[in-house]
Amino acid sequence: MRHLLTATATALLALTSAPALAGEIWVTNEKSDTVSVIDADTLEVIAEYPTGERPRGITFSKDFSRLYICASDSDTVQVMDPNSGEILYDLPSGEDPEQFVLHPNDRHLYIANEDDAITTVVDTETREVLAQIRVGIEPEGMAVSPDGAVAITTSETTNMAHWIDTTTYEVFANTLVDARPRHAEFVKQGGELWVSAEIGGTISVFDAATQAEKAKISFDIQGIHPDKVQPVGFKLTPDEKTAFVALGPSNHVAVVDAETYEVLDYLLVGRRVWHMAFSPDNTKLFTTNGVSGDVTVIDVAERKPVKTIKVGRFPWGAAARP
């Protein structure tokens, strides 16, 4: 495992002794085995740090003092000090961790183990495995309700969302979704669960209390074959009125009215757009474009791309730090 800064990171760190007021966007580069750091104000890459093999999922602790990274091919979750770029230690994650979600208690990490059809729960303080929960085949998407009572794992091959009681670590419901569910998030103060289906080309909206489907969002981009319109990551604005949805190899982001579930617009971005993160002030949206190896910056108010930023090879996940 490479825990030393690259020469690039060392040089760039000299330029970043003072914290950026507008915050940072941290991007995992799946084929470079690095994370890139973008200044959310200047829109420039200011650092790059080495990680384990094939970094994908990425998230911060509540106080932003720790960065968690799924190093999938290293079979571990790495914990980084974002102030130095140093890998502090590894967490026991199970095999091939792809995505995870941090519980609202800021302590328990729920990890999707793609190869083992398991969700692993790890205590980030004691560094112990609390539970391993059997779910469907190829788990990936992870979510947890705002009150912390329910965790979700989506399984790509089983085509289900699995509802987990976080007290007992037991699955209490399974709901069918369209083909190859990739990403899940609780929205509307936890009242709804949204699940994207990459091959199905949809987002399913569930009533979180009853687990019943209440709406389905479909996408149709003029001039692009439906097979290329593959929803993956998505984010809602803080007022939860507008959703932005990454549509994979269609190279577009959809803008959706989150109240009517109608698609309002499609924005052209880089190639194979996968995940996204808002800037800390929520004025910009940063999308990871795997095949083109860059990040597109979208002006949220204007709903238009304003810049493309080159990062590492196959950028995958993104997370913001103020």
State where each predicted segment sits.
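Predominantly soluble domains enriched in secretory-pathway, periplasmic, or organellar proteins
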Residues: L5, L13-P322
